């Protein structure tokens, strides 16, 4: 269910200086103004939603910097208010459209990308809006470091099948699948489940008996 639009959200974000990045150029030019330890690995979540996943990651892994990207101001306000309950030097958030991600981040500057429960855009004519469409993946390949991973989770069967069969397996010269499951929560004692941090949507889907699908992949050397 979508949140009711908060007309004051853009103004709220502009007034905030803790966790919120209001100058996108800082991510390319001066990470030291964003993170206390800018030399740490950088993991990003595209479409961070209300922030449960990325905030918990930042709490558990102080040795990694986390950047949450979300294009809807109303949603990122919710995430920001959750983050304010903690004192974290390794977390930042920005309201930004992933279509323009090459304007936001330098080449080979990112160590991992998380795509969690992205909008499935079910209609064929909207396929290019899917975050696992090749037009997005080509951009992700530019900002990712050598051998860096993309981790993709979804409850949506059609989006997952599209990602696996129409994208990743369609060109084996571009992508390498390192982990794949059609039902993450059945993998008892598997490291992927043991380390899993659920998003707010994921918790609801699991309670409803939905199968959570996941794939980890990377871009092959000659295509980065």
UniProtKB/Swiss-Prot annotation:
EC number(s): the record gives 2.1.1.33
One Pfam family named in its UniProt record: Methyltransf_4
Q: Which residues bind substrate?
A: 123, 155, 199-202
The GO cellular component terms are: tRNA methyltransferase complex
The catalytic activity, as recorded, is:
guanosine(46) in tRNA + S-adenosyl-L-methionine = N(7)-methylguanosine(46) in tRNA + S-adenosyl-L-homocysteine
Please verify whether the record's keywords include tRNA processing. yes
Question: Which enzyme class?
Answer: transferase
Per UniProt, which keywords does this protein have?
Methyltransferase, S-adenosyl-L-methionine, Transferase, tRNA processing
Q: At the top level of its lineage, which domain of life is listed?
A: Bacteria
Pathway(s) served: tRNA modification; N(7)-methylguanine-tRNA biosynthesis
Query: Which GO molecular-function terms appear in the entry?
Result: tRNA (guanine(46)-N7)-methyltransferase activity
Catalytic positions are 119
Q: Where does S-adenosyl-L-methionine bind?
A: 45, 70, 97, 119
Presence of keyword Methyltransferase: yes
Which Gene3D superfamilies does the record cross-reference, listed alphabetically? Answer: Vaccinia Virus protein VP39 (3.40.50.150)
Q: Which HAMAP family match?
A: tRNA_methyltr_TrmB
NCBIfam families linked: PRK00121.2-2 (NF001080), tRNA (guanosine(46)-N7)-methyltransferase TrmB (TIGR00091)
- Please describe what this protein does: Catalyzes the formation of N(7)-methylguanine at position 46 (m7G46) in tRNA.
Q: Which family does it belong to?
A: Belongs to the class I-like SAM-binding methyltransferase superfamily. TrmB family.
UniProt-recorded name of the protein:
tRNA (guanine-N(7)-)-methyltransferase
Species of origin: Ureaplasma parvum serovar 3 (strain ATCC 700970)
Gene from which this protein is expressed: trmB
């Amino acid at each position: 269910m979508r949140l009711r639009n908060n007309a004051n959200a853009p103004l709220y974000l502009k007034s905030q200086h803790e966790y919120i990045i209001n100058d996108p150029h800082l991510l390319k030019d001066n990470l030291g103004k964003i993170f206390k330890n800018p030399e740490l690995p950088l993991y990003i979540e595209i479409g961070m939603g209300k922030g449960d996943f990325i905030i918990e990651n930042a709490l558990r892994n102080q040795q990694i910097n986390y950047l949450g990207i979300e294009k809807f101001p109303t949603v990122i306000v919710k995430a920001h208010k959750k983050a304010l309950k903690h004192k974290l030097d390794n977390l930042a958030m920005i309201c930004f459209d992933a279509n323009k991600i090459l304007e936001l981040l330098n080449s080979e500057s990112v160590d991992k990308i998380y795509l969690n429960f992205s909008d499935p855009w079910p209609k064929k004519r909207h396929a290019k809006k899917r975050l696992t469409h090749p037009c997005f993946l080509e951009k992700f390949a530019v900002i990712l470091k050598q051998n860096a991973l993309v981790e993709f989770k979804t409850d949506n069967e059609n989006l997952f099948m599209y990602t696996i069969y129409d994208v990743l397996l369609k060109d084996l010269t571009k992508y390498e699948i390192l982990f794949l499951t059609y039902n993450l929560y059945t993998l008892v004692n598997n490291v992927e489940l043991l380390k899993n941090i659920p998003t707010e949507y994921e918790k609801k889907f699991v309670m409803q008996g939905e199968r959570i699908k996941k794939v980890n992949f990377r871009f092959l050397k000659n295509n980065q």
